[in-house]
Amino acid sequence: YLKSIQIPRENCLVVDADPRTCDGGHLPVAKQDEIQTEAERLVKAGTYSTIGEALFNLDLGSGNYSCARCHTKGWSYGDPQITGGGGFGPNLTGGSAVRQFPQKSDMVSFIQGGSEYGKRYGEQGQGSGRMPAFGAMLTDEQISAVVDYVRGL
């Protein structure tokens, strides 16, 4: 009688029993395209300067695909403070993201895979399991754009 509201993923591995939680899949391409289209619209409208900034702050789907939801205090309840300044997630400003991930590729991999409880990441990170894996939600190009933006905060 309970029903999940998660969007089923595409390209799940055969061993994955449930397409809503499969490890090998991703959001439907139509949803990924919707995310990209909205980010491009926000840049064209002048709301944000780059696709990475737009994706970081994207409120599509109540912020389910954005970083600001956790990394900007007040963002989730309509009173955003310093962008990337920390909230539920850590502060990403002042070069802290670059210090944690000196190599861009390591930061991309972390965002794609998320945090695992007790597993080390970056230079000094200790996983809590709170950082979701965005690799199944955003494309590699979108994640790279977000990383470029965050590394400049």
What are these regions (language model features)?
Residues 5-6, 12-20, 46-47, 113, ...:
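Short, flexible coil/linker elements and helix-boundary hinge sites characteristic
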Residues 19-63, 100:
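Electrostatic cytochrome c docking/interface patches
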